[in-house]
Amino acid sequence: MGRYSVSPVPKCLLLMFLGWSGLKYYQVNAAQLREYHIAAQLEDWDYNPQPEELSRLSESDLTFKKIVYREYELDFKQEEPRDALSGLLGPTLRGEVGDSLIIYFKNFATQPVSIHPQSAVYNKWSEGSSYSDGTSDVERLDDAVPPGQSFKYVWNITAEIGPKKADPPCLTYAYYSHVNMVRDFNSGLIGALLICKEGSLNANGSQKFFNREYVLMFSVFDESKNWYRKPSLQYTINGFANGTLPDVQACAYDHISWHLIGMSSSPEIFSVHFNGQTLEQNHYKVSTINLVGGASVTADMSVSRTGKWLISSLVAKHLQAGMYGYLNIKDCGNPDTLTRKLSFRELMKIKNWEYFIAAEEITWDYAPEIPSSVDRRYKAQYLDNFSNFIGKKYKKAVFRQYEDGNFTKPTYAIWPKERGILGPVIKAKVRDTVTIVFKNLASRPYSIYVHGVSVSKDAEGAIYPSDPKENITHGKAVEPGQVYTYKWTVLDTDEPTVKDSECITKLYHSAVDMTRDIASGLIGPLLVCKHKALSVKGVQNKADVEQHAVFAVFDENKSWYLEDNIKKYCSNPSAVKKDDPKFYKSNVMYTLNGYASDRTEVLRFHQSEVVQWHLTSVGTVDEIVPVHLSGHTFLSKGKHQDILNLFPMSGESATVTMDNLGTWLLSSWGSCEMSNGMRLRFLDANYDDEDEGNEEEEEDDGDIFADIFIPSEVVKKKEEVPVNFVPDPESDALAKELGLIDDEGNPIIQPRREQTEDDEEQLMKASMLGLRSFKGSVAEEELKHTALALEEDAHASDPRIDSNSARNPDDIAGRYLRTINRGNKRRYYIAAEEVLWDYSPIGKSQVRSRAAKTTFKKAIFRSYLDDTFQTPSTGGEYEKHLGILGPIIRAEVDDVIEIQFKNLASRPYSLHAHGLLYEKSSEGRSYDDKSPELFKKDDAIMPNGTYTYVWQVPPRSGPTDNTEKCKSWAYYSGVNPEKDIHSGLIGPILICQKGMIDKYNRTIDIREFVLFFMVFDEEKSWYFPKSDKSTCEEKLIGVQSLHTFPAINGIPYQLQGLTMYKDENVHWHLLNMGGPKDIHVVNFHGQTFTEEGREDNQLGVLPLLPGTFASIKMKPSKIGTWLLETEVGENQERGMQALFTVIDKDCKLPMGLASGIIQDSQISASGHVGYWEPKLARLNNTGKYNAWSIIKKEHEHPWIQIDLQRQVVITGIQTQGTVQLLQHSYTVEYFVTYSEDGQNWITFKGRHSETQMHFEGNSDGTTVKENHIDPPIIARYIRLHPTKFYNRPTFRIELLGCEVEGCSVPLGMESGAIKNSEITASSYKKTWWSSWEPSLARLNLEGGTNAWQPEVNNKDQWLQIDLQHLTKITSIITQGATSMTTSMYVKTFSIHYTDDNSTWKPYLDVRTSMEKVFTGNINSDGHVKHFFKPPILSRFIRIIPKTWNQYIALRIELFGCEVF
């Protein structure tokens, strides 16, 4: 644990930080200054350290030159001692809410580096990140500290960024160097930052409520991208590879806090697993921590089982590469504090479950039935055995359940198709004991290892990578023909939490060699349940139906039986080249329950049933499996979503309500292999009264499995189809002996019999197997066959369909509205159009091997005003940031969305929506759903065709509670989702609470932005020429694609329109519809946020997984321009970043028309009448001619223009007319245009749906009318265009706003916020009737004595302001004064400043490095404004007059902001 010094906070800071009360049970400590002395230094690092005696013999090939953070004593001469476990990690920084962290940083390395935190409150000169944020050189010293230099970073831990009520005591973040994210990380510059609740830390910085805490970083270091390049890829924990991580120590009954960091410069996922243990993360019980590169998690664990346990990432390539270590739990004599005492009633409910499970070898057919709709390329690659491929049948090993320990009578005679390749379902609730008698009937050693429960070493069933042969016990590897009994109890610490589902989804598998055993087929599902979740039969109480779906990738190349399969199924086994990429790929099978293609049978559910899905990802997969449910949504962890992301070797439990008639698809979203292999269709249908009667009769039996009822004729038909379970010749003898097949190898079907009491036992076994039964009303032979029902035509009994009439979208919408009776119809006109899209600029650090093409033909969605599709709906300021995205489709809960879609592109496209409810005729996606032709016209709209989609917004599509305003989804073309999206056809859907959308179809009182994070791969676009695709050689050597563009909303680096006010509620809707490898971790510099609907959890970064739609809420606390980026370094470097600007909420300052700061030459117009020149258009101007005026002629469009000579923020406009000879002239209505360059003009649209917003003008010639500009305009040129007027178009104007860089508010001279005592001078003039004291030097002060005058007029005089604390001063306005008839003002002056009121420094001219002399006033009443570039950072400032008119007289205002 790192050491640091702690100092009390000054009283003023203490008062500022103590505003957060914290949790009641925390002892509130005084806020502290926690000081760290950290250096970046060179170090030779060995990823695979050898024992000392071996390391002397040979130099390791794994030694690399790294730059690392290390903690030092105060003088940076002596390094602080450190824990060997921390490895490459820098010291762990800790702070409680209310604390300030001061990091004294010194760079001992040879490269400029920095320190940047993922979460903290900091100003611009403590950010540690370099980008174009408009700051001055003095504020950029933190960005990159040169070698040999030092810098002091100051970070504050405020209540706004601290852990929320539901968070753990400390949240985990990372700090790292942000000079070059890719090279800095791969060089080793990273450490952990813990932000903790008030009162949660001990004096030494450790946590109070845990016995131990550990930081583990699972990381992939690419040494070829280190500053000191050396080709190598290292998979490590804390920088240790191949199990060389020092053992993590714990005692039995310890409570451990784990702070886990994932890191890689490329997209990476980690499935962190602690063998034999369970954890709690965000109030959910888990056995695997889902971690992505660039993000961190906090979890806790209570341990009780002693022994040495494996810590690893279960991603297949991580296991093979040696990413593992060990947790060593010892018996330290501690009492058992984890097991609670049970009542007598609870003791009586404890159950002992006994399973008899064997491992058997079979021939498995991955696709016993191949529908004609299967993609032909996929079929040729994976299912056919042409080209000397193995095909779709493989020898495998599976788990099979038996009736008893004799292992002679399987629980099912015929292999249940619905179960697929899975072993039997093992279920248990807390305190239950599970006994598994395992017999190995296979030809090699196997075992059973269970996830999600705490087990003892003798019940673990797993061999570790470093286990010597002599340590391999019988339970770890059960030899062929042997029997071993695994026994374990579900502990209190394993029980699902209050937030969890009744039963949480886990898995079991053989773990002799985990990768090869799973590849061979040995997997099964495990359910760990709450204490009241199961009936005595093992059936879940709170669900109508349970369904298991295991998304497994079987890499047959790693199976134990590869050689057997080559010999049996390849046409020429001796010619097979196992390292041939095509052959290898053909053996990687993407399956759902072991099936690698859709099946002809369709899973059946009853309308309104509540289905509990148990979803698991297993196998040789190194990417996320996104599971998409069409026409319905999952309810998981309190959130409705239609895509669930499964990490390798992890499971999710989700509830689905069957509320949408039709045949729908459950499939994996993403790659071609996944979407074709991992899929099944299911039927949501009403059944006849007879079925319903049967269901009611058996209601009390508690069986909750879906319908597999098969009429006898269907069974007979199925007998003609090859059964998927085909015994090997070696297994035939056993099958015959067991009476499972006859002499000819045909399955034996038992005769029909009357249902008996034994059926209940049979049904309980079906439950254990995860089978789907028809409420107990099925005959035994039908139950044992467990074939799926012949699907009914869901549309045949659908009263909505009349096949004799044409589809009428208005009737469909009307029916929806009549059903709900409280919604509105919202109509959109959207077209698909082809455009040329330019990704340029390529970027500041982009390197490409040949001339980079950045302009590509794409298709986009565009909104139109009506069904003629002649007039596009022009986007305004609110749409400026959307980039390539289609128009935002907004609706409220219970609304109906009607979209008339026209395909103006050259190939078929459609519209497919996520999260909404629709009939099959509005799905916009094509698959074999048994729909009538009438319902298939939506699948693909031909070029120039038109179709109307109707989508309903049920409550599940909208916000889950009152704190959430709107929920985000997406729509896209679903003809070929991958290619359509990469072509550009995608847009956002926002579903809001009732009353949140105004008449212009915009959300009320919400600042919202939609960001789509996507790596566009133009080679996957429909429009990419095949001749331009990357060569095979380029792909094989991993050359960065010339045609991929990481971007936000399709725009690398420079997304525009992200402007907001300080402290306002900003809602960000974040989308990721990329493939399984598209992992983005979103970070907003200088800000933290919460996820909508989950405000109890604080976030510093947000992992954005494939198919994710996340709505987050932020209250920006720091003004300025900030970076929004992905934490995945390689994508960030190539363009997945943007800038957002936070404007001061007081950004409504007069910009200088009335005061004269804006010169006459800066005001121009299309023309004027008489003497009414544009330079007169100044608010409250006086005189005979005091405004701009023009006579409007027919077909002329007059305007007046202000050139602000720099980019500024405009937030409001004040206008006046004029009166001459009692005649009023004024503008009644006008619109505004603006420009950055004076050539390209944009019409301000604001909230209006029309092409421009018409501002209400004046009603007479004297009254001032103020209009608010929202969103704010950032521009140099502003034009006002009068459209309606009285007498003549006439204007007197003032623009309101502030500087783009922010920090430009008045500091208090005019307002009086700066006290009189804080204003001093060298002297001041006294007369018998007045004193011209320094405290009078306030801008626009009125009165006879209204300025500062010195006693004498010479160059030694000065006016001084004490700002009381360090302040950033960005500009100054000076003004003279008039005494009697004497006009007095300062013509030139200089500026001096200091922090200590002792050593004064002159403000220098950056061009000459000499003292800068500023030009002052030219009259006594006008204003002159000067900007300090760079700004002044100081407490004291002096204005020193150099020349003056008549006498020295000053009135001033300073502008800037506080440092903190």
Curated annotation (Swiss-Prot):
Q: Where is this region: B?
A: 693-818
UniProt domain Plastocyanin-like: residue ranges? 32-196, 206-330, 351-529, 539-685, 824-992, 1001-1143
Question: So which residues are the signal peptide here?
Answer: 1-30
Give me the residues that bind Ca(2+) 2, please.
K920, F935, D938, D939
Report the locations given in the UniProt record: Secreted
PROSITE patterns to which the protein is assigned, alphabetical: FA58C_1, FA58C_2, FA58C_3, MULTICOPPER_OXIDASE1
Give one Pfam family, short name only.
Answer: F5_F8_type_C
A single Gene Ontology molecular function, please?
A: copper ion binding
Kindly list every residue the record annotates as glycosylated: N156, N204, N242, N406, N471, N557, N944, N1001, N1180
Q: What tissues is it present in?
A: Expressed by the venom gland.
Annotated site (Cleavage): R772, S773, R818, T819
Keywords (alphabetical) are: Blood coagulation cascade activating toxin, Calcium, Disulfide bond, Glycoprotein, Hemostasis impairing toxin, Metal-binding, Pharmaceutical, Prothrombin activator, Repeat, Secreted, Signal, Toxin
Every copy of the F5/8 type C domain together lies at 1147-1298, 1303-1457
What is the role of this chain? Snake prothrombin activator that attacks the hemostatic system of prey. This non-catalytic subunit is functionally similar to blood coagulation factor V. It serves as a critical cofactor for the prothrombinase activity of the catalytic subunit, which is similar to the blood coagulation factor X.
Note in the entry: In contrast to blood coagulation factors that circulate as inactive zymogen in plasma, venom prothrombin activators are always found in the active form in the venom. Hence, catalytic and non-catalytic subunits are found naturally in venom as stable complexes.
**Protein's UniProt name:** Venom prothrombin activator pseutarin-C non-catalytic subunit
Species annotation = Pseudonaja textilis
